[in-house]
């Protein structure tokens, strides 16, 4: 129900971003003003924008899995596109109504091409950074003092793991990397604090292998987890 209500907003937003992209590409090179090129790029854009819907409607298959992965990456990149374009348009709106020097150059065809290229570089940089951080386990160490008796224990080395998001994008290779880092910390106890699955359970490519990999976590007092 929520998806149906948000669908018109999503489509309008995608159309707005498409119009901005076409204007920028046209200012970069006249080849992007040709109808044939625009139609081809529009088909690709529609495929990306509707990949999440198409994947939902298709039966489970390798192609459906591919579309799910595409839609996951698309939604992540789309967020950066929206933020970058909105900030750029707000700055454009403000500068257009001020006595900004060289305003004519900024709002010329060449200026539009430069601004659009800067936006593209920002979007690509944040997208690559996001993909990298999602696929590489980050270890943060903290010392916490609890003002109560620990019985026979003076200290406890706890490893807290969160947001595994197993699914179409994160699988067994990532879990191998994570388990290796956990075991290197030599924990007394391991806690998995939710969001184990990103999509549905069926999104995991080989759940038996993932389970085998996770069973390799070594700790003195065991591993405790909550689904999310």
Model-derived regions: residue spans:
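Membrane-embedded segments
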Residues: 134-140, 145-228
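Non-catalytic terminal accessory segments
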Residues: 1-135
């Amino acid at each position: 129900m929520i998806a149906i209500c948000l669908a018109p907003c999503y489509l309008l937003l995608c159309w707005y971003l498409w119009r901005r992209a076409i204007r920028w590409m046209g200012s970069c090179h006249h080849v992007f003003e040709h109808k044939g090129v625009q139609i081809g790029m529009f088909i690709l854009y529609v495929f990306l924008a509707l990949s999440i819907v198409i994947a939902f409607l298709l039966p489970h298959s390798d192609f459906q899995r591919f579309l799910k992965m595409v839609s996951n990456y698309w939604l992540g990149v789309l967020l950066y596109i929206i933020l970058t374009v909105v900030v750029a348009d707000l700055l454009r709106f403000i500068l257009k109504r001020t006595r900004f020097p060289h305003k004519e150059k900024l709002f010329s065809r060449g200026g539009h091409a430069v601004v659009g290229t800067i936006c593209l570089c920002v979007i690509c940089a944040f997208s690559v950074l996001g993909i990298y951080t999602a696929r590489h386990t980050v270890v943060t160490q903290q010392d916490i003092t609890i003002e109560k008796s620990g019985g026979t224990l003076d200290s406890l080395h706890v490893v807290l793991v969160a947001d595994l998001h197993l699914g179409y994008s994160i699988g067994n290779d990532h879990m191998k990397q994570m388990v290796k880092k956990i075991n290197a910390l030599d924990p007394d106890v391991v806690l998995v604090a939710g969001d184990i699955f990103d999509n549905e359970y069926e999104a995991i490519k080989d759940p038996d292998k993932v389970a085998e990999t996770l069973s390799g976590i070594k700790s003195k007092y065991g591993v405790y987890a909550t689904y999310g």
